[in-house]
Amino acid sequence: MIHLLLVVAAYLLGSLSFAVIVSRAMGLPDPRSFGSGNPGATNVLRTGRKTAAILTLLGDALKGWVAVVAARGLAAQFGLDDDIVLLCALAAFIGHLFPVFFGFQGGKGVATALGILVALDPWLGLACLATWVAMALVFRISSLSALVTAVLAPVYAGLLLGWNDSATTVLVIALLLVYRHKANLLKLVTGQEARIGKRS
C-alpha cells in the first residue's frame, strides 16, 4: 500500500503545471493558448516576462527533484527497496506530461526531467544541463537542445550509474520526452521551429 501511495503522491506532485500556475498568478495568458501551446518555460518566455519563465522553470525542475528526494527518504525510513524511488521519478514525470489538475494537457518535461536527473545523480544532471545549455547557445532552439540532451542522457546514465535500473528509467524518460517533441521534430526538419525568446 505504501508503494502505491508514494507513486500516486509523486504523480500528483508532477501534475502541478507551474507554467499555468505562474501565468495565472502574474495575470498572463494561459500558455496553452498561444505560441507552441506547450505549458512550459520556453512558451511562457514568449510573453516577454522573463521572471515568469524563470519561476516556471524552477518550479517544474523542483517538483521532479522533490519527488525523487522525498521518495528516497521515505524508502529509507520504511525499509523499501530502491525501485520505489525510480517508480516515483517516472510517476512525477508522467504527471507533468499528463497532469490530472489541468485536463491532462501537460508540458514536454524538459525541466522536470532535469530535476529528476539531478536528484538521481548530481553529475548526471550536470552533464545533461551542460549539454542543453551548449546546444541552446549554439543553435538557439529549445526543442533541438532538448532532443539532443534526451538522446545523450541514457548514455550518460549508463556511464555514470552503470547499465542498471536507474539507466533504464532514464531511458524511459528520454523516450517519453522525445515522443512529446514529435511535432517539434517536423518543424526542425522543415526549418519552421521557433528560436528561444521569440515573442508569440
UniProtKB/Swiss-Prot annotation:
InterPro entries: G3P_acylTferase_PlsY
Nucleus listed as a keyword: no
Disulfides per UniProt: none
Gene Ontology molecular functions: acyl-phosphate glycerol-3-phosphate acyltransferase activity
Subcellular location(s) per record: Cell inner membrane
Transmembrane segment boundaries: 2-22, 51-71, 84-104, 113-133, 143-163
Major location (coarse): membrane
Record keywords, A-Z: Cell inner membrane, Cell membrane, Lipid biosynthesis, Lipid metabolism, Membrane, Phospholipid biosynthesis, Phospholipid metabolism, Transferase, Transmembrane, Transmembrane helix
Catalytic reaction list: an acyl phosphate + sn-glycerol 3-phosphate = a 1-acyl-sn-glycero-3-phosphate + phosphate
EC number assigned by the record: 2.3.1.275
Domain of life, per lineage: Bacteria
Gene Ontology CC annotations of this record: plasma membrane
Gene Ontology biological process terms in this record: phospholipid biosynthetic process
Pathways involved: Lipid metabolism; phospholipid metabolism
Membrane topology per record: Multi-pass membrane protein
Function: Catalyzes the transfer of an acyl group from acyl-phosphate (acyl-PO(4)) to glycerol-3-phosphate (G3P) to form lysophosphatidic acid (LPA). This enzyme utilizes acyl-phosphate as fatty acyl donor, but not acyl-CoA or acyl-ACP.
Family membership noted in the UniProt record: Belongs to the PlsY family.
Subunit architecture: Probably interacts with PlsX.
Protein name in the entry: Glycerol-3-phosphate acyltransferase
Organism: Thiobacillus denitrificans (strain ATCC 25259 / T1)
Taxonomic classification: Bacteria, Pseudomonadati, Pseudomonadota, Betaproteobacteria, Nitrosomonadales
